Amino acid sequence: MIILVLNCGSSSLKYQVLDMKNESEYSLLAKGLVERIGLEMGEITHRVPEKDKHVIDKPIPDHTEGIKSVLELLVDAEHGVLKSLDEINAVGHRVAHGGDLFSESAVIHSEVIEGIEKCCELAPLHNPANLLGIMAVRSLMPEIPQVAVFDTSFHQSMPEHAYMYAIPYEYYVRDKVRRYGFHGTSHKFVAEKSAKLAGLDFNNSKIVTCHLGNGGSVTAICNGKSVDTSMGFTPVEGVVMGTRCGDVDAGIVTFLQSKYDLDVKGVNDVLNKKSGFLGISGVSSDARDIEAAAKEGNHRAALAMEMFRYRVRKFIGAYAAAMNGLDMVVFTGGIGENDMSVREDVCTGCSFLGIDFDVEANKVRGEDRIITKPGSKVVVTTVTTNEELVIAQETMRLTTK
C-alpha cells in the first residue's frame, strides 16, 4: 500500500512516499520539501534513496500548486518513483490541533474538515495550513481517501485535574481554554518502541518521554495512556525551547504589556520568537551553537543550557510523582537523539529515582539504545522518532478497515 504523507506549514510543505507492506514493514520511496510557497520564487528539494537530491526553483503561488508539483515529480521519468499516480492508495496529513473533538485519527470527510476549521482558533498558524493541504489534495485527487493524524489526540486521555487551568471555569466552557499538549504522535511512537526495546509491557508501565528539539515537550504515560504533558493550551508552555520561553509567570505578560506598551502580537513575538535558548544566550536558537558558545566561556549560553536541563529534570521528577512510580525514561527529537551531554546531565540528576546511568552506552547519536546499566531500577533509552511512519500506519489502519 503506497501512502503519501503531507505536513503542510504556512509557506512550506514536507512530504514522504512510503510503501507499506504491513504496519511494521515499509520502504521509503521518496521524500522532500517545498519551500517559499506564495513568494516570488519557490524551491522544491526532492530526494530518492541512493540518488542525488534534485532541486527545482520555480514560482509556487499556493499549496495546490506545491502539491501538484510534488505529484508531477513522483511520476517524472528521471526523478520519479511511481509509474502512475493511481499507485497512491491514500494520503495522510499531520494536523496540529484536534482540540477536544478528536481523540484519535480520522478519515477526512466534510464533518472532519468542519472540526479542523473549528480548531483553527486554537492553532491559527498551523491548522489553516493543514487545511490548505487537505483541500489541495481534494481538488487534485478527489477520489483518494485522506486521513488526519492529530498532534493533540494522544493527550486526550489526560484526566480533568491535569488538563484544566485554575482560571474561571467559563473560559473552558465557552472558549475551550484547557491544556491540550502536542508532539503526541511522537510521544506514543517512541514509548511503544522503547518498551519493546526494553522488554516492558507498554500497557502496564510508567514511562516519561522527552521529545527534545527546537520545540520540546515531556509526557507522562501510565499504562499506555498520556496522563500529563508539559505543553499546554499552546506549544509555548513547558520546557525551555529554541525560541519559546516554556513555563513563565503569567504576570510577566501583563507587566511587559504595561511597561512597553506591547500589543498581542508584540507579546506573542517575545514569548514565541525571542525567548528560549535565543533569548537567554543572545547567540542562537540552536542547541549545538549554544553548547559550542558555552565551551568557549559564554556565561549566558551556559546558563541557557543549564536552565533547559534543569526544566527537563524537574518534569521527570514531577511525572514520577504524578504516576506514583517510574519504569522508563525515553529521549528523542534532535537534542534527545544526538546530545549525549544533555542525556547524561539530566539522568545523573535523577539518580534518586533509580536510574543507574551507563556513560559508555550513552556514547551514541541517532541510534536506538538502552543507556542504563543492566539491573537499573529505571530503564533509560534514546530512540529515533518517525512521525511520518506513524501517520502512514494510521492512514493504512483507517483506510483498510
Listing of model-derived features with the role each one plays in the protein:
Residues A302, E306-D327, G336-K401:
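Internal helix-turn-beta structural module
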Residues I221-C222, V227-D263, D269, G333-V364:
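Catalytic phosphate/nucleotide-handling subdomain of diverse soluble enzymes
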Residues G9, H93-H97, L212, V330-N338:
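Glycine-rich beta-strand-to-loop/alpha-helix junction loops that act as flexible
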Residues L73-I88, K196-D201, I316-D327:
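Phosphate/pyrophosphate-binding loops at sites that engage ATP/ADP/AMP, CoA/4′-phosphopantetheine
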Residues M1-G99:
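N-terminal glycine/serine-rich phosphate-binding loop of ATP-dependent small-molecule kinases
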Residues F154-K259:
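Glycine-rich phosphate-binding loop of actin/hexokinase-like ATP-binding domains
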Residues D269, G276-I280, A287-A322:
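Adenine-nucleotide phosphate-binding core of ATP-dependent small-molecule kinases
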Residues L74, E78-H126, V147, F154-A162:
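Short beta-strand-loop/turn "lid" adjacent to the catalytic site in phosphate-handling enzymes
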